[in-house]
Each structure stands twice: as C-alpha cells, then as structure tokens.
C-alpha cells in the first residue's frame, strides 16, 4: 500500500493531511516543506515530487507571500502578504493535480506582530470553505515562540478552535529556533535557549489535543535558520525521542510516537541529523535557504556561460548582427534555476526517505 491508496493527488486538506502525516510517521519518512515565492519556485518543487513519486509541502512565508503579490506593493496592514498567500494557494491548487502528487499547502512562520496576515488567510479559508466544503489552505504555522509559554499555548489554542470546524492543520513552535526567518529574528539568543523541555511538549500536547487532532509541534533542539558552517550548530534531534517518551508516559498509551514533530532550520543539517529526527517522529522538514541557493546556482552558471550573449539584444561572439533572443528569453534562464532547485529538492526527498512512497 502507498500514499495514493489513502489520499488523493492535488492539494489535500483535513483528514487527508492527518492520514498523510500518520502514514509518514508509521513508515519512517518525512516530507520536505519547500518555501515558494513564485510560480517558478513552486514548479521546481513539484517537478521533484513528480519525479520522485513523493508527496510535497509547499509553503509561503510572510515575505515570500509579499513578493508573490509584487515586491513594490505596499504591505500596510499585511494586505500584500495576505493577497500573495491567497494567490499562491489558488495557483498551486490549480496546477498541483497536473503533477499527480499529494500537496500540502502551508503558510510558514507567523509571529505575533504578523497575526493580521494569519487572520486574512483564515478569512480566505472560511470563504472558500463555504463554497467548497474545505479550506483554501491545508495548514498554517503560528510561531509565538518569542512570547511567554502560557501566552503562546493559549493563543495557538484559540486559533485551533477557529481552525477545527474546517479541519485546518495547525503547526506551532515551542522553544526558540535561532537565526532569522521572515518576521522572526532570534539571532541574538544564547545556545542554551535553543532546547525545548519534555514538560513543554506535554503542556502543548495536553492543551491542543483537547481541541483538535490536527496539529504538529516544532520543538527546539538547537535549530538555527539560515546559513551556517557545519559544526557551528549543536543539533540534538535525539531529544525528540525523549519528548515522545515523556508524552507517551503521560498519556499511558502504547503509541511510541504520539506527537507529530516538525524539523525547522533544515538547511545545512546533516543527513544523519534529519534521519535521527525522523526516527523520533519528525514528519515535516523545512527547507528554504538551501533551495534559494540552488535556484541561483542555475541562473548564475547560465549567465556566466552566456554573458557575451546577454549584453545586447543583437550582437555576440558569432557576429555583430546575430540576435540573442534565444539566450535572454526569461523562459530559458529561469528554467535553469528551476532545474538546479529541482535537483536540490530531489536530494531532500532522498535524505528523508520520501522517494517512491506514493
């Protein structure tokens, strides 16, 4: 049995998201969550999923959503980020079935100061639900980790109450992920603050599970967003196993992995770190920085190779009257970026044991 025996292709929601994550947890793999900022980056990720016969998660950050709506657009009141996220969701919904893979449409890190963005997406979900019987987005991520724990959990719980009638999946963060990500800057925190305690996980699980089964937890185990040299970050994904054991004991259950965990700050981490996390119940891994660099690699190499064909519309080493349109056509050099990004997503799918799970 594979994933397509239990969920459909295209954007999935509600119980199908729960089925997908449960299947991943039971079969020992995780699904890459790729940040997309355009139709081009979305296609690059979808191409990888199709080639690997794997599910995929596509997510828009606040800044990525703003870019989707036009970088020069005013984002007063988060209106551009709201519009960009909605546009991305509609686009991905329309194109995803063509690729023949299940897709989770997700919104990434929403800090407290960005909650108007979240509210705008929820309004779009509710409007879409009235017509189609399902939300526009599959899931949303609330990052209130900068707030006191009690406030963090209470506010996430309120959003869960709003989400549960539509069966929207909610991802939350407890503990601090270092570095900087759209709207959340934790680059100043000490390493000792980057580790969540088992009691924290239980507090979250106890409160949210009283409202909804559709939630996952991004626990901190030394994670850092962005670019860093190997060895500079002390990741301890095995801590997630201790968290699972603690929650199992509190629940008095036979399920060794009752919690759906998320691995943040995945760019630059080792394959062993990923796979240790997966063994401990990680079902989603965020990848952004690595795919950004992979995209620019293809464009960079193309520009360097054909630089003499990109200076003027006409005239190149082959002759002063030779046209260059076939070289500067955006469809050509943008596709070079897509190809190298697709290759990087394929690597993630292999690292996370996601290949051929359909």
UniProtKB/Swiss-Prot annotation:
Binds 2 Zn(2+) ions per subunit. One is catalytic and the other provides a structural contribution. The keyword Phosphoprotein applies. Zn(2+) 2 binds at residues 143, 173. It is an enzyme of class 4 (lyase). The keyword Membrane does not apply. Pathway: Carbohydrate degradation; glycolysis; D-glyceraldehyde 3-phosphate and glycerone phosphate from D-glucose: step 4/4. InterPro entries: Aldolase_TIM (IPR013785), FBA_II (IPR000771), Fruct_bisP_bact (IPR006411). It catalyses: beta-D-fructose 1,6-bisphosphate = D-glyceraldehyde 3-phosphate + dihydroxyacetone phosphate. One of its GO terms (biological process) is glycolytic process. One of its GO terms (cellular component) is nucleus. D-glyceraldehyde 3-phosphate binds at residue 61. It holds the Pfam family F_bP_aldolase. Catalyzes the aldol condensation of dihydroxyacetone phosphate (DHAP or glycerone-phosphate) with glyceraldehyde 3-phosphate (G3P) to form fructose 1,6-bisphosphate (FBP) in gluconeogenesis and the reverse reaction in glycolysis. Belongs to the class II fructose-bisphosphate aldolase family. NCBIfam families: cbbA, FruBisAldo_II_A, PRK09197.1. This is Fructose-bisphosphate aldolase. The gene is fba1.
């Amino acid at each position: 049995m594979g994933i397509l025996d239990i969920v459909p292709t295209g954007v999935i929601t509600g119980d199908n998201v729960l089925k997908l994550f449960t299947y991943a947890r039971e079969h020992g793999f995780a699904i890459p969550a790729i940040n997309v900022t355009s139709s081009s980056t979305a296609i690059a990720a979808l191409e990888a999923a199709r080639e690997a016969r794997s599910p995929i998660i596509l997510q828009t950050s606040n800044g990525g959503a703003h870019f989707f709506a036009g970088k020069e657009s005013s984002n007063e009141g988060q209106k551009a980020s709201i519009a960009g996220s909605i546009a991305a969701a509609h686009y991905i919904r329309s194109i995803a079935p063509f690729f023949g893979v299940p897709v989770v449409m997700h919104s990434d890190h929403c800090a407290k100061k960005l909650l108007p963005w979240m509210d705008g997406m929820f309004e779009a979900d509710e409007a879409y639900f009235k017509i189609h019987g399902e939300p526009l987005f599959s899931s949303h991520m609330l990052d209130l980790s900068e707030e006191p724990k009690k406030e963090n959990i209470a506010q996430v719980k309120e959003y869960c109450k709003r989400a549960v009638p539509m069966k929207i999946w909610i991802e939350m963060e407890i503990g601090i992920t270092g570095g900087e990500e759209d709207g959340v800057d934790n680059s100043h925190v000490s390493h000792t603050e980057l580790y969540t305690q088992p009691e924290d996980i239980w507090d979250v699980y106890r409160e949210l599970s009283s409202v909804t089964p559709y939630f996952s937890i991004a626990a901190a185990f030394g994670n850092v967003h962005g670019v860093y040299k190997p060895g500079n970050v002390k990741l301890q994904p095995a801590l997630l196993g201790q968290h699972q054991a603690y929650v199992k004991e509190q629940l008095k259950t036979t399920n060794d992995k009752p919690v759906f965990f998320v691995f943040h700050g995945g760019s630059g981490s080792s394959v062993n770190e990923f796979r240790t996390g997966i063994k401990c119940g990680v079902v989603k891994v965020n990848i952004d920085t690595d795919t950004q660099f992979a995209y620019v690699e293809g464009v960079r190499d193309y520009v360097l190779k054909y630089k003499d064909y990109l200076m003027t519309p006409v005239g190149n080493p082959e002759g002063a009257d030779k046209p260059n349109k076939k070289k500067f056509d955006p469809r050509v050099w943008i596709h070079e970026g897509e190809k190298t990004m697709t290759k990087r997503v394929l690597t993630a799918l292999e690292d996370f044991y996601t290949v051929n799970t359909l």
